[in-house]
Amino acid sequence: EISCSLVGSEMCIRDRPIIAVVDPDMMSSMPKGLTASTGMDALTHAIEGYTTKAAWEMTDMFHLKAIELISKSLRGAVANTKEGREGMALGQYIAGMGFSNVGLGIAHSMAHTLGAVYDTPHGVACAMMLPIVMEYNQECTGEKYREIARAMGVAGVDEMSQEEYRKAAIDAVKKLSADVGIPSVLEAVKEEDLQFLADSAHADACAPGNPKDASVEDLKDLFRKIMA
């Protein structure tokens, strides 16, 4: 991706590979912070892909398995364990197989904008926005948050009410992000920036796939939640 701060967006450059080599041993030298942020980006791929407007049965299978693998493996990958690296290599790959067919949502739209305007690492921005966007989207996701909570290892989801399992899924994402050391606020964001940020995110290519249509004013309110 190439960032352009003037328009507040990150533009994707695509060069389709003939073959991709996914080798966890090649990831063993990644710093902890990079492992954490890219892992949360992969989780955002999986959760947004699972809940996007275009989601369907086949991609749901990919995304739920990716959520399960990433949730089980990211802490270990950050600690550089062999099992953690292997699980993340497979989880991020499966998430890519899913979302590349159905697109993403406004967590990515907003993360693209934060990256372009403030040079925020993409995975960090995704991790900040994901639980906020999940809370915003929850009324338009049916029972999918129950399956997200289950895939993330939450116990007793079958006995939970809709309100309870939706909160459990969001809380599980927050805990994983905190456990791998990602902050929940971005001090660079100022009130006077919100209009530009929201306009840019609203125009992002990922925004139309969000399960709940977000207005510019909605996006301003969501950006406000990561302000210090």
What are these regions (language model features)?
Residues 1-8, 12-13:
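Single conserved hydrophobic/aromatic residue that forms the stacking wall/gate
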Residues 10, 16-78:
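Core active-site phosphate/anionic-ligand binding loop and the adjoining beta-turn-alpha structural block
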Residues 43-47, 88-96, 110, 130, ...:
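Short alpha-helical scaffolding segments that buttress acidic/His motifs in well-ordered protein cores
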Residues 66-110:
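Oxyanion-binding "anion nests"
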Residues 93-126, 204-209:
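Glycine-rich phosphate/pyrophosphate-binding beta-alpha loops
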Residues 117-196:
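Gly/Pro-rich interdomain helix-loop hinge
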Residues 192-228:
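Short, amphipathic C-terminal "tail helix"
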